């Protein structure tokens, strides 16, 4: 298995997995255990982005990374919206370990304003939305630049979502494949 655990100490990132708490669009925890995994190639790209952020006196905060296929089904059953969630019958980049949902923190640990909260299923979350303030656009573009220069692709509907290119080439994983189960 090519999934490795992402820890704050090893990657110098902040981890706040939204689906391990009730603070997500379902209103209930989806993960029983807050463990952050990524495919080893995605982990290398995350490390590069984290290093670039650190050079600007910023840090990455991860809201979600690997998502077991069972969790993708739970989210889809709750909100089957193909503009914001991958249909689990096709497979999500998250369930392949090659996607990450994240934001930027300033030097004090405060999140930079991004115009919406994570998982706000609204057009205001789209990259390039002109209905958010210019300073907020700047923050989104800063995140976009850090991630794309590190080898990530973006999803146009979600300012927080990045995935490796050619994500479908990676296999899907369920909870049973993990060294420390999440579900």
Range-by-range predicted roles:
Residues 1-65, 77-157, 165-183:
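Extracytoplasmic cell-surface/polysaccharide-interacting catalytic and binding patches
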Residues 162:
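Conserved metal-phosphate-binding beta-hairpin within the catalytic cores
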Residues 68:
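Segments that shape or occlude catalytic/ligand-binding pockets
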């Amino acid at each position: 298995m090519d999934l490795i655990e992402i820890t704050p100490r090893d990657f110098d990132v902040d981890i706040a997995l939204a689906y391990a708490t009730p603070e997500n669009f379902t209103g209930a925890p989806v993960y029983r255990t807050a463990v952050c995994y990524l495919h080893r190639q995605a982990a290398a790209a995350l490390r590069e982005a984290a290093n670039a952020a650190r050079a600007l006196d910023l840090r990455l905060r991860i809201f979600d990374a690997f998502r077991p296929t069972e969790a993708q089904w739970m989210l889809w059953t709750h909100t089957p919206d193909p503009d914001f969630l991958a249909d689990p019958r096709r497979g999500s980049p998250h369930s392949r370990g090659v996607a990450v949902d994240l934001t930027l923190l300033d030097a004090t640990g405060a999140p930079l304003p991004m115009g919406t909260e994570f998982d706000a299923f609204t057009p205001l979350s789209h990259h390039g939305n002109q209905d958010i303030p210019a300073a907020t656009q700047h923050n989104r573009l800063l995140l976009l630049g850090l991630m794309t220069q590190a080898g990530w692709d973006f999803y146009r509907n979600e300012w927080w979502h990045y995935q490796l290119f050619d994500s479908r080439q990676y296999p899907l994983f369920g909870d049973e494949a993990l060294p420390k189960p999440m579900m």
